[in-house]
């Protein structure tokens, strides 16, 4: 398959170096974008390939066979950034973000993990407060796949509390945040 050939030819020769140096494989990601790997399950009307989930899974599997890092870059971009926008975003958000993400012009990431909570969504400390017609997020995330390399982030934050099964629980929401948003900064590795 195209995925296997690409993985063997373009990804495998660099896999050990990528893992040892922890340098983001930008050139490889750009090549994957050229081949349409970053938008495989995205409908064609949003700039993707319009393929089924099995085709996408085959791509990630072939990449993972030779380089787990590269497979995770693709899956975080596609499954954790594009998919929430496609599933829960407004039409305006889909039109604004998905075509550039699906074509690989922009890279996506997902921010859930926090220093004191790990991936426990109910342990989240990052808060979002509505200020006029804008949400203001305040908190810290860590271990974000595609981190500093990404352009568009899905960030998880607490927006309030709700009653669930007789007890109060945190209401968790997802926000689309663009790199360059005032106050959105990166710590050191």
Regions found by a protein language model. Give the residues of each.
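Short, intrinsically disordered, charge-balanced linker/junction segments flanking boundaries
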Residues: 1, 187-189
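Amphipathic, small/basic residue-rich leader segments at the start of a protein or domain
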Residues: 1-76, 92-103, 107, 130
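Conserved protein kinase catalytic domain
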Residues: 60, 82-85, 98, 154, ...
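A short, Trp-centered hydrophobic/proline-enriched beta-strand micro-motif
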Residues: 104-112, 156
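Short, solvent-exposed loop/turn elements at beta->coil junctions and helix N-caps
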Residues: 112-117, 142-143, 189
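Cytochrome P450 C-terminal beta-domain/meander region
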Residues: 120-138
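A short core secondary-structure module
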Residues: 134, 138-187
């Amino acid at each position: 398959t195209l995925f296997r050939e690409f993985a063997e030819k373009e990804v495998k020769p660099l896999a050990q170096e990528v893992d040892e140096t922890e340098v983001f494989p930008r050139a490889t990601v750009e090549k994957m974008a050229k081949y349409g790997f970053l938008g495989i399950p995205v409908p064609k009307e949003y700039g993707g390939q319009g393929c089924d989930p099995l085709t996408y899974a085959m791509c990630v599997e072939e990449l993972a066979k030779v380089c787990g890092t590269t497979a995770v870059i693709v899956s975080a971009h596609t499954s954790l950034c594009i998919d929430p926008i496609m599933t829960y975003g407004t039409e305006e958000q889909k039109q604004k973000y998905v075509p550039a993400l699906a074509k690989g012009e922009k890279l996506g990431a997902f921010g859930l993990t926090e220093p004191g909570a790990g991936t426990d969504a109910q342990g989240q400390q990052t808060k979002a407060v509505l200020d006029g017609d804008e949400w203001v997020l305040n908190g810290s995330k860590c271990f974000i796949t595609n981190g500093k390399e990404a352009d568009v982030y899905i960030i998880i934050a607490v927006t309030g509390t709700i009653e669930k099964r007789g007890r109060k629980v945190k209401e968790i929401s997802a926000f689309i945040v663009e790199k360059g948003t005032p106050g959105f900064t990166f710590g050191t590795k």
